[in-house]
Amino acid sequence: DSMCRTIMSAGSRRGAMMATMRCDHPDIEDFITAKSDAARLRMFNVSVLITDAFMEAVKSDGQHDLVFDGQTYKTVSARGLWDKIMQSTYDYAEPGVIFIDRINRANNLGYCETIAATNPCGEQPLPPYGACLLGSVNLARLVENSFDDAAQLDAGALADLVGTAVRMMDNVVDASNFPLEAQAQEARAKRRIGLGVTGLADALLMVGQRYGSDEAVKQTEDWQHQVARAAYLASVQLAKEKGAFPLFEAEPFLASGAMEKMDSDVRDAIRKDGIRNALLTSIAPTGTISLYAGNVSSGIEPVFAYAYTRKVLQKDGSRSEEEVVDYAVQMWRDKFGDTELPDYFVNAQTLAPADHVKMQAAAQNWIDSSISKTINCPEDISFQEFKDVYLQAYELGCKGCTTYRPNAVTGSVLSVSETSDEAPESDQGADVIYMSEPLDRPAALDGNTYKLRWPDSEHAIYLTVNDVVINGHRRPFEVFINSKNMEHYAWTVALTRMISAVFRRGGDVSFVVEELKAVFDPRGGAWIK
């Protein structure tokens, strides 16, 4: 975790890591709650590898053995363990769930590798030393006659674009400089790539379909089928030109779960000419890509908000506020002006979780790797309804399930302000944006005081941290520092008041610890956990 904090890209984005554990490991109960302390494992995503046998035991309310190296350490109620996973996810948004048997059964390379983990976002199940090579096709840009009865996706253009993308991504395998030789060998022996889509929700809107509807589910599966078919045929063509990937064996490859349902002419072509890339399709989050592509919807996610305001850094260092409009909404405005949006323009907040799951399952039918998708749940969803989301994901064939339920513990990654016809009177400036209201201070708080020694100071420092309990969860609320040493007193008071102000805003405040741990006194000493 500490190592990962040293990694930074784009000036601010930290690294990310994934930790997984099988549901039958003896330590699984501790693993499930590993991130209930917000200050721990900040750089990790954690997921439980769920087996088919475990899910069957959950359904039948059977027993489940926790085993390691052939020895059974404990036998637990399968349903009880499942409820522990669900409760932690309900409260803390982790761990995620990965249906590992399903992943290995569908893997084109099942004859030469076993998957035990995915990348942090979950769209790439990978073997040891496996690497992600991801790309996306923007479906929204391929819609013809948008918002018209004749609106449709240009199938020919899609096939051509997919073919070009596969060729480009295959070249990247050879052009990449991998940090480790084992990574280079793994990549070039199998040549796996992950071509996906972005702008799906916008494309559906532009052909007049509501995300999550039966029509949209069917359309999504059809488009993904077109992408998969074109990608596999393009890879066969590359195999004819450059040779199949080194570990290719036709019969075991074609016997995999993913290939069994592939079109017969594609299977025949693979059997005859081989295939250049072992796996070809994957759907990544595409958050940054979607912005570059005109603010299209991300991956296969629904539109989160149709318009919002961003502060954009200018060349002179100033910032200007600009309205950012969803691509489909902009296309609607260009065509119809200020005409009200049709009722099929739904967003992530108004969709039922079941609609999310149906869309993920529809796309998964033609994705040989996996999908990064978040199923947004309302804060007031009941625990039983929440558990049903995961059971639905399993029954519909998803390879994993990730949910997000905003609450006082986790906060909210993104939020959409509610609008009203009458704006409340306020003496605040119009440019002030309130992310959240401060928590009220109870009359009495529980806390702890710690006696600390600081280098070069003969007087002890007394650090007091008071906590508040919200929805049954304890979290820091305020911090004080007292000492007979008056050196830097004003700065110390100012710092603790600012830290306390952050605590009172709620949400995940563990970043405060990470920031202060990077501050060192040149005379010795540091802010440490």
Enumerate the predicted regions with their spans.
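Glycine-rich phosphate/pyrophosphate-binding loops
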Residues: 14-19, 207-213, 372-373, 397-410, ...
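Catalytic alpha/beta core of large soluble enzyme barrels
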Residues: 123-125, 169-174, 256-260, 269-276, ...
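Active-site cavity-forming subdomains of large catalytic enzyme subunits
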Residues: 1-155, 178-185, 231-240
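Structured alpha-helical segments in the cores of large, soluble enzyme domains
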Residues: 1-10, 28, 47-57, 88, ...
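Short, Gly/Pro- and small/polar-rich lid/capping loops
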Residues: 261-272, 415-464
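Terminal amphipathic helices with adjacent charged low-complexity linkers/tails
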Residues: 33-36, 48-59, 103-130, 193, ...
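Internal maturation/activation junctions in enzymes
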Residues: 12, 69-71, 161-184, 188, ...
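Function-dense linear segments that define catalytic or interfacial modules
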Residues: 7, 89-187, 192, 199-203, ...
